[in-house]
């Protein structure tokens, strides 16, 4: 029974599935389709495949898994769609149903359920990765590093950002008062996000300094973790996503404003209610939480 198709989540967006007029306009804009011009990798093809899957009560095959994974959720197709189909919602729902039906697999299970939700453990693993990076990844311009030679050839010499020597949570206090001689106008909690915390802490530090100079007292809860975007938006693990969302709601419960400089974090947290709320209580909590979130990037 576990392999059978689930429709609990994607079924909520069945009307969006029916909106597609199969005009093919998405083929001109999809970044995945530009690299892999196959019908199954563009919104039109995915829409049809998901409709067929729901109609026939089929199963999530390996081909379907591959098709669902080939989407960055950039919404470029939706922005240029003549009927404004909300394809992103369809993809997120289908990924959740696929994960519920087929499971995550060992490596994603280790990363998304056992590592990322445990912030201290995650930070320790990232710290170990930073040592590996210094040993085997030559430094390039600025804060970027080359992949090791044996991978660089396979991945076209790509660069990745260097992991910071000191995380943001270790650079700033939990309570950051406004600058001397400045009147406190607002009090806001700061959601760092993984990239700012581990890779670009100087951005977060400068943001806090700017806000405190302009009358904003900034609280940085040290127990905060990931927004959950890679887990429930990317991997479709709604169960772990709810656990993370519940934790964030609890940590930031007393905040009047929640600010972040990460667009991914802000968009993910604002969508908790739409995708993850499976009870009336969660719907209320997530809705109240999302109203406090502000992207200040």
PLM feature spans:
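Alpha-helix capping and helix-loop boundary segments enriched in small/acidic/polar residues
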Residues: 18, 37-41, 231-239
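Short, intrinsically disordered, charge-biased short linear motifs at domain edges
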Residues: 5-17, 57-68, 178-179, 212-214
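Non-heme iron-sulfur electron-transfer modules
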Residues: 1-6, 33-63, 84-112
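N-terminal, well-ordered alpha-helical segments
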Residues: 28, 48-52, 66-69, 75, ...
